[in-house]
């Protein structure tokens, strides 16, 4: 029945509990069913699912589907325990945020999640910025033409400094390898 998309019916509370299960299949199915539901604790639940199984691309897809418009909240939740977030997870989440969130929200992310005060290690910041750059590429904010991640923080000194710092760190990291 599950292969046809027919899941056992469960309450939101049951699904949130199942998302914390030790069984990866139970976690995955609960996460899939959480898509389209709103709950204030959803970002924390989704972050815990990612922490338990972020290496699995299907789990990541289920989490990102369930996050929908709460992708920025999910990123904020992941930042509370930054060592658990995998680079590929941050890159994918950054791409989703870059494609769908408004310009002001993206600028806020550049200010809060990058630079010296961020909880993320530099490799995570590079992965997140790469994803944001992929997502933002070609978007048209306020009729300004197609945007790149380099153009987004113009006129925002803190966001610009944070972005520049990540590019410098990425170049240094590439040279050191």
Predicted regions mapped to residue ranges:
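Long, ordered, helix-rich scaffold segments
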Residues: 1-177
């Amino acid at each position: 029945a599950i292969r046809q998309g027919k899941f056992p019916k469960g309450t939101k509370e049951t699904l949130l509990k199942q998302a914390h299960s030790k069984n990866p299949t139970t976690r995955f199915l609960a996460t899939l069913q959480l898509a389209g539901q709103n709950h204030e604790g959803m970002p924390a639940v989704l972050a815990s699912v990612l922490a338990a199984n972020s290496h699995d691309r299907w789990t990541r897809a289920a989490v990102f589907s369930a996050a929908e418009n709460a992708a920025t909240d999910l990123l904020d939740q992941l930042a509370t325990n930054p060592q658990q977030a995998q680079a590929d997870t941050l890159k994918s989440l950054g791409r989703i945020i870059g494609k769908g969130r408004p310009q002001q929200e993206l600028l806020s992310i550049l200010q809060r999640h990058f630079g010296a005060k961020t909880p993320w290690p530099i490799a995570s910041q590079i992965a997140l910025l790469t994803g944001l750059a992929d997502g933002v590429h070609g978007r048209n904010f306020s009729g300004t033409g197609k945007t790149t991640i380099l153009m987004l923080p113009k006129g925002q000194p803190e966001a610009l400094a944070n972005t520049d710092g990540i590019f410098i760190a990425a170049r240094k990291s590439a040279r050191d390898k």
